[in-house]
């Protein structure tokens, strides 16, 4: 916010214009001033909240000026409502506050008891108790109240500072004065902040964690005396607190409640804004959704910093050290986020990744799941990195430092290995071919033999070690009833690294589905592919199609189908073959007999010959010149 616009309202002769003049002149103006002062703008100075400019608009309460008054009230950020005697005080509740509500404005109101220099006005505690607090209790939009005197120049600067602070650090979203407690949204935000600062997740902010919190929020060290005073304040309100271990969540919330009760709500706002909260107590959109675009033919992956963050997160929340995250540990881990990512719920997490015998997500499965999420929905990963507290090593970097963009692989047929650590393979085939069992086997699940048709798309992700030792994450996706829509979607196919054509070698009608599929979608020829004969533990049968699978693949100058069974221990070699083909796509392309020869080597040879000829000519010319 660049400017705070203050609308000064109140009955006639309450001293509105005198307050403004006293602020500008820094003293009381004895000369008669005009009934309504022109609008003034004051630039920010030292101590101005959030370094904002301030525009002050004087108004008239006369009925003939009501149109202008309505217009100014609707344009302002805060209303300074001034009264000066019993009559104008009564009008605060009877006219002014209902009038503001009738206009539908939702701005804070600062209530000002002016002309405190006059005899018979009472003491400040008496005025606060008898006049100001009842109005604040009745009208929640009243942010604060103060006694002033333009003649004595008493609290003149302070009243306008309160107006500025009511906009830059509003109390209304934080604290309910009537009920005397922090509001739910504020509590939720502070709970998340506590969670992020409790680095060891023991339920307490220890001395070092408090010092780190102080440095982050207030850019100054926390002395031992300061920490002792904080603990003393908490102990007075919560005598049962165990402050020897540190400050627990109830103590942290109580501390912030004390700030609100003492009018130090700007302290709470400093904390909230350091953790990227807006005035509506939601996280800043630019924080959880920073700009991040994946160029065409490229993909997104976790960077080393991103993997390190998720490894650390796993180790912290695996409280029982059993090597897996159970439901309670996952719930605690995702406490500062709005639950699991919706894509995880849709894919029936954790069944989409690696689990141990107890059904708990292993570290391998945890990293594989995030690798898949980053590949398919990088913006979801970025959003959850923000929720879960990722902090880049360089303060100038954004959360996107946890991700990296791969080199584009526009020409899949180019020789060599693509620089990708996460690859996607679509598993296509007839119903009952064994695709679901293949995905289960990929996740080390036992084979049950019961057939359940796949309706929704299903994914499985796991790490695979390539020949040479490099590890990649392989995503196998069974398309279900969305198969036609996905195979017609060029963007979906561009994201795919490999097609696995799977058929049941014991079913005579299984392979014809693949033949028909390739005829229906000829653009599938543009993708690298592998043919897989599943259920090889059963008796092999001839397929009812023009060419048998071996003949069909040979006619395409491709490798013969890989014969495997999910009941065999060697099934893991199949997934290595998939990952290897996905990362070296030139080895898995169909080539028809009509396709011309690969002239790459010829072009290289001709280029070398031409370079040699130019060099020889240059040497001959130099030799001739030398003669």
Swiss-Prot record:
Membrane-protein topology: Single-pass type IV membrane protein
Domain of life: Eukaryota
GO MF entry, a single one: calcium ion binding
Pfam family, one: EF_assoc_1
UniProt keyword Signal present: no
Segments forming domain Miro: 1-169, 420-584
A single Gene Ontology CC term: mitochondrial outer membrane
Binding positions (GTP 1): 10-17, 58-62, 114-117
Cytoplasmic side: 1-599
The protein's Enzyme Commission number: 3.6.5.-
Gene3D superfamilies named among the record's database cross-references: EF-hand, P-loop containing nucleotide triphosphate hydrolases
Residues involved in Ca(2+) 1 binding: 198, 200, 202, 204, 209
Keyword annotations: Calcium, GTP-binding, Hydrolase, Membrane, Metal-binding, Mitochondrion, Mitochondrion outer membrane, Nucleotide-binding, Repeat, Transmembrane, Transmembrane helix
InterPro entries, A to Z: EF-hand-dom_pair, EF_Hand_1_Ca_BS, EF_hand_assoc_1, EF_hand_assoc_2, EF_hand_dom, Miro, Miro-EF-hand_domain, MIRO_dom
Transmembrane stretches, start-end: 600-620
Top class in the EC scheme: hydrolase
UniProt xrefs under SUPFAM superfamilies: EF-hand, P-loop containing nucleoside triphosphate hydrolases
Any single GO BP term: mitochondrion organization
Mitochondrial intermembrane side: 621-627
Cell compartment(s), UniProt: Mitochondrion outer membrane
Binding site for Ca(2+) 2: 318, 320, 322, 329
Residues reported to bind GTP 2: 429-436, 465-469, 534-537
Family assignment from sequence similarity: Belongs to the mitochondrial Rho GTPase family.
Function of the molecule: Mitochondrial GTPase involved in mitochondrial trafficking. Probably involved in control of anterograde transport of mitochondria and their subcellular distribution.
Protein name stated in the entry: Mitochondrial Rho GTPase 1
Organism: Gibberella zeae (strain ATCC MYA-4620 / CBS 123657 / FGSC 9075 / NRRL 31084 / PH-1)
């Amino acid at each position: 916010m660049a400017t705070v616009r203050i609308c000064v309202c109140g009955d006639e002769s309450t001293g509105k214009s005198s307050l403004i003049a006293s602020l500008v002149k820094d003293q009381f103006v004895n000369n008669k001033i005009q009934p309504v002062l022109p609008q003034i703008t004051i630039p920010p100075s030292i101590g101005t909240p959030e370094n904002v400019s301030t525009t002050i608009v004087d108004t008239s309460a006369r009925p003939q000026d009501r149109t202008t008054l309505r217009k100014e009230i609707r344009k302002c950020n805060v209303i300074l409502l001034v009264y000066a005697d019993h009559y104008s005080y009564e009008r605060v509740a009877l006219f002014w506050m209902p009038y503001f509500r009738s206009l539908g404005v939702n701005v804070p109101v600062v209530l000002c008891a002016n002309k405190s220099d006059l005899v018979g006005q009472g003491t400040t505690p008496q005025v606060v108790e008898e006049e100001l607090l009842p109005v604040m209790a009745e009208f929640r939009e009243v942010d604060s109240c103060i006694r002033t005197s333009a003649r004595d120049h008493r609290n003149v600067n302070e009243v306008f500072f309160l107006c500025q602070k009511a906009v830059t650090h509003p109390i209304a979203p934080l604290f309910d004065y009537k009920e005397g407690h922090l509001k739910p949204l504020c509590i939720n935000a502070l709970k998340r902040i506590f969670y992020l600062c409790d680095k060891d997740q023991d339920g307490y902010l220890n001395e070092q964690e408090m010092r780190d919190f102080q440095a982050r929020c207030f850019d100054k060290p926390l002395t031992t005396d300061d920490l002792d005073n904080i603990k003393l304040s908490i102990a007075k309100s919560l005598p049962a607190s165990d402050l020897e271990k540190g400050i627990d969540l109830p103590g942290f919330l109580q501390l912030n409640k004390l700030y609100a009760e003492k009018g130090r709500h700007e302290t709470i706002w400093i904390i909230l804004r350091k953790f990227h909260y807006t005035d509506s107590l939601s996280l800043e959109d630019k924080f959880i959704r920073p700009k991040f675009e994946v160029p065409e033919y490229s993909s997104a992956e976790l960077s080393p910093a991103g993997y390190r963050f998720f490894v650390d997160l796993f180790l912290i929340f695996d409280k029982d050290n059993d090597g897996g995250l159970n439901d309670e540990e996952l719930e605690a881990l995702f406490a500062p986020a709005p639950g699991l990512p919706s894509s995880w719920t849709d894919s029936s997490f954790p069944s989409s990744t690696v689990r141990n015998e107890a059904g708990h997500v292993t570290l391998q499965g945890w990293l594989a799941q995030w690798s898949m999420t980053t590949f398919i929905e990088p913006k979801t990963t970025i959003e959850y990195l923000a929720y879960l507290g990722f902090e880049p090593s360089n303060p100038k970097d954004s959360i996107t430092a946890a991700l990296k963009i791969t080199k584009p692989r526009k020409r899949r047929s180019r020789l060599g290995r693509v620089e990708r650590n996460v690859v996607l393979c679509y598993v296509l085939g007839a119903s009952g071919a064994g695709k679901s069992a293949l995905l289960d086997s990929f996740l080390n699940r036992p084979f049950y033999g019961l057939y359940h048709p796949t309706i929704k798309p299903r994914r499985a992700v796991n790490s695979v070690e390539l020949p040479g030792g490099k590890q990649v994450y392989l995503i196998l996706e069974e398309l279900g009833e969305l198969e036609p829509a996905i195979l017609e979607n060029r963007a979906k196919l561009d994201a795919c690294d490999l097609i696995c054509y799977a058929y049941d070698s014991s079913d005579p009608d299984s392979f014809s589905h693949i033949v028909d599929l390739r005829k229906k979608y000829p653009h599938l020829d543009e993708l690298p592919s592998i043919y897989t004969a599943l259920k090889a533990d059963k008796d092999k049968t001839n397929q009812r199609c023009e060419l048998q699978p071996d003949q069909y693949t040979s006619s395409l100058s491709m490798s013969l189908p890989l014969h495997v069974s999910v009941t065999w221990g060697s099934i893991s070699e199949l997934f290595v073959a998939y990952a290897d083909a996905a990362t070296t796509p030139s080895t898995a392309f169909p080539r028809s007999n009509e396709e011309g020869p690969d002239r790459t080597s010829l072009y290289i040879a001709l280029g070398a010959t031409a370079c040699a000829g130019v060099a020889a000519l240059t040497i001959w010319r130099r030799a001739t010149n030398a003669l």
